[in-house]
Amino acid sequence: MLDIEGLTRHYGTETAVDGLSTRLARGELTVLIGRSGAGKTTLLRCLNGLEQPDAGTINVDDAPLAATDAALVFQAGALVDGKSAVENVLDGALSREPAWRELIGWHSPDEKRVAIERLHDVGLAGYADRPVEALSGGQQQRVGIARALQQQPDVLLADEPVASLDPETGRSVLAVLARAVSEHDLFGLVSLHQPGLADTVAGHYLGMADGRLVLDRPAAEVDSDDIEGVYANG
């Protein structure tokens, strides 16, 4: 299990995450919802090690979560133009390879093989050499997911990954994300402004308001009134 206990993060006098406690299960995509400013992004950044909480613990299988154990898919993909899809995926291996290899563009044959496999995982097997700027928005987000998988994480996070996509494309990207979490037996957490897009792939819902959890329930037990209640808070 991924156990979050008493997680708190302050910005000056403002409390972004307020004593949050929950548990996530492996192989299941948890959908994180709430108004803008509810604390969703701060929670993800604490889980990814981009920010340090002021209090609380984050443990995976009873051991502290390390920053290298979590990978984050960003809202806008954060890909590098001028590089191919597979080159962007290979950037996910930087924590495991010497920096000089990236400087000269050299990666081990094993890393290249795995990168191709990760593109296959997200439905882009034939796009390895395609420049990322030539890909559609949905395809770019799939490359972002493949790059995150290349990090070999225990925890796969995504911060509003479909915010700029049309609903049909957004659903397909979320399906890819959920499949990756299931097939690689990861802990998955994705924040969304459009919770309806995830109704077929969510295994669990977390709802935040004013830095606190106001919903923590399996998807099968969540209805539209519960979702609306999250947005009525705060």
Predicted regions mapped to residue ranges:
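Helix-to-loop junction immediately C-terminal to a conserved catalytic motif
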Residues: 48
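Conserved ABC transporter NBD signature motif
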Residues: 56-68
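Conserved ABC ATPase "signature" region
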Residues: 101-127
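Conserved ABC ATPase signature
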Residues: 131-135, 139
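Catalytic Walker B motif of ABC-type/P-loop ATPase nucleotide-binding domains
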Residues: 156-159
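H-loop/switch region of ABC-family ATPase nucleotide-binding domains
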Residues: 192-193
